[in-house]
Structure formats: C-alpha cells, structure tokens
Amino acid sequence: MQKEISRRRTFAIISHPDAGKTTLTEKMLLYGGAVQLAGSVRSRKNQRATTSDWMELERKRGISVSSTVLQFDYQGYQINLLDTPGHKDFSEDTYRVLTAVDAVVMVLDAAKGIEAQTQKLFEVCRQRGVPIFTFINKCDRPSKGAIELLDEIESVLQLKPFPVNWPIGDGADFKGVFERLAKQVHLFERTTGGAYMAPVEVGDILDDFVKERVPGETLAKITEELEMLDIAGAEFDSDEILAGRTTPVFFGSAMNNFGVELILKGFLHHAPPPQGRPSAGKFIEPSDEQFSGFIFKIQANMDPKHRDRIAYIRICSGKFERDMMVYHSRTGKKVRLASSHRLFGKERETVNEAFPGDIIGLVGHADFGIGDTLSTDKTTNFHEIPRFTPESFSYLHNSDTGKFKQFRQGLEQLLQEGAIQCLSLKGSTVAVPVLAAVGPLQFDVVQFRLESEYNAVSRLEPAPWQVMRWLPAEFSEEEMDKLSPPTGSRFGWDSERNPVLLFASDWAASYFEQNSAGLNLSRVPPNQKES
C-alpha cells in the first residue's frame, strides 16, 4: 500500500477570476494524456468546452461555478486534480476543496499580479500549512516585470519565491523559459488555438538555435537577471516548500501551452504525497490499516436521467474496497459503500479499490452530509468543515404552481450541496423559501439549475437583510419575544434549525450587539468555533 500512497498527488488550482485557472487545468489534462484536444473556456460554439466546466451554466457563462474532480495517471503518478471556482461568491466551495488537498497551484495573471481573491485563498492555504506552487500566466501578453512579480509575492504574501524557470522575453516577444535547475532553454512554438501540445526546442543558452530565435539584447538581459537571482535569490529548499514558506515559481502561457509541461512535471516531483490528519485526539497516518475519509462536497443531479447525488470523499487512510462496511460518524450507523466511482469531470466509472489521497464519488446515500467522516474505526472523526456566514439573502418564488413538485424536489436536492441555506422565518405565514448564501451569484445558479435540470421556473426577489448572526443554540421563541432588535430585523432558524437573527445592515447588527449586554451573538453556528 505504501507504494500506492507515495505515487498519489492530490491538489487544487486556485486563482482570482480570469487569471487562467481553468485553462491551466485543461492544459495539464492535455499534457497528462487525459484529453487529446484541449478546450477553452472562451471557446466558440463549434469548439470544445473545457472538461472541468461541465455544467450547462458554466458552458454558457464561461466561468466555473462548482469545483470539479479530475483523475488521471501520468508518468507513474496517480493524480487527483481539483479545479475550483474563482469568483468570491463560490469561495465556500473552494474552501472545502482546500481541506481535501495536500498542495495547491496558485495561478497569477502576469499583468495583474496578486489580486484580492488570490490573497484570500492563499490565507486559507497558509492556515492549513499547504505547500503552494505558483504559475505566472499570460507571459505572452503585456505584463509586469518578472522581478516585480517576485517582489510582490514576497511583500504581499510573505512567501519566499524561488523561480524554477525564468521568462525569455515578454509580451508578444515571449519566446520561452530558462530552466534554472537543469540550466536548459525551452523555446516554444504556438499552435492553433492552443488545442495541441506546443512544439518545443530544448538546449543550452549558447546553442545556435537560441541565438537565431532570441534577440541579443534579450539574451543579455536574462543572463544579467539570472546572475542576480543566483546571487541574491532564495535557495531551492524542499523542506521550506513542503512547510509552505517557499513557493516554486513557474512562468508561461496556459492558453498557448507555454511552460505547462514544466510546471506539471515540477509539481509532481516536488509536491508531497498524501499527508496525515488529526482526528478526535489522535493523528491518522495514510498508512494506517483502518480505512477513513471525509466528505467535502456533494453534487446533486450529475446524471439528470437518474436524479442522483454524489458525495465526494477524500480517502485519508487505509484501502477502500467497494461494498465495504464503514461507520458514519454523524449517525453512528454502519453503511455499505456499494456504488463507488472514479471521477473525471462529469464522467464516472465504477471503482473497486482506492487509496489514501484518492477522491472518489459515492452514490445513493441520502444521509451523507458535508464534513461527515466514514471509517472502519468508530472512534475516528475528522474535524468538521466550517460553514461561511451568509451575506446575501433572497426569496425564491415558484413561478408555475403546476410544477410545484419539481420545484420542491429540485430545491431540496440543491440545498443538500451546502452552497446555500434555506431559512425559516419566525411568524411567517407565506411558504416562500428564503435563501441565504455567501454571494448573490449562488442564487442565479439555483434559479438556472432549477429550470435546466428540473424544469421548474422560479423568480428571485431580493430580501431586505445583509447580515445574519446566530443566537445561542437553545434560544426559544419566548426569549426572542423579549428582545427588541432594530427595525427591519427578523428572527428565524437556519437549515439545521439553529436560531438566527437577520439584520438590515452591519450598523444595525453592531448597534444591537452593543446594546444587548449578556446576549452572545455569533458569526458561525453554535457547533462551530469562530476563527
């Protein structure tokens, strides 16, 4: 089993929207041999869409709205690659993915450097001590200087950058990269639409083909920069990389396949295999005999013909075997894992065995929820996955009374994914769902999917609240009646029947907290610690 563990690499790709995250994902699949022809997020109708953006809404909008698992073998490695949504409204899904990986590839736009969402996701990685590999993308467009980008990584993220390779030229004159550890030049040629692997010439910086294709002043400039890096730059230290204090930096252009193979190979060589995890007072090593794993994502309706739901489980220890019996931590019951699948975007195939680091899909278990532990050892219970505090609220009206059954069934299944909550309001006599989410785009996703997947048309109506706080767990309706929150506030319960109080503004929430001595209002549910 140790051999299987050591060849696993489980990682996510993160970035600010439009930095090229999903494009890099697709090109890694191309170079990894998992696809023969790479699609593009911004592809025209007669071209292929990306493998990871399989949902109809993603294809229409050209953005990722849900994380995707892609598994493939490459040069002896078993790769579990997770593409994540970039937009902040989907950050809760991305955060859950980051609990399930052992390393991260951070994509930066060479023209923009570190952007807001990148910084937020980086902080999550830092808290978890996850190693970070950096790909500076779009070097074939007008961009910041390479040294400026390294300085930005160090000053903004407090992360020591080690450039594994160095760009030769920039913008329209970007020719390739110099690989510092191997001391080799890689010069690329463009392919039509970037759909195929880019032809590349590899050799010494003094070779004739380099002098023919790269202007003398460009060669002189990078020679000077490389000397400066050797004198002043950080050393390549594997321990510092694995500790998350140093980030290897790769330059390239995902759209044109420049440098993609180099980061794929570099990452696989230097990234860690599956790591151990804390669980209820003990530490679970991947090599432990007892099987264990946790559910970090639920996807409803992946197969519209069967209206099924898939629970994504990260295997942490032991060997998974189809039909095995395990304990379900939240219910204490024993369950049989009969329908298990290997995942590749929307595609799936039955898997009979899997090992630590693998992500597999389990079908047919309505009781499974996000954060649940499954294990052959009843005492194993991994830390719960935190929920984000909702900041957007909306009523969701069913537009067709004749389709109420489809509307209700669809909403119930989409709620199980955990991206949105359905609130119950105290004293409400109208059966209109009140949705709560991290951002308003989540509501658009629900509305679109209800119509496209369940044939249920709905209408969104903005709700008048901006802030939600949790009351103590046992807070009763009688106790609610004794309070006088600001005008526009509303008492209610979240999807797990925890009492909440909704406010029209941050000011109203702060005012009420300051004038309610002894009342403990929380930004997280009662069973979750505030970070």
Question: PLM features: residue spans?
Answer:
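Structural and coupling elements of P-loop NTPases
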Residues: M1-S531
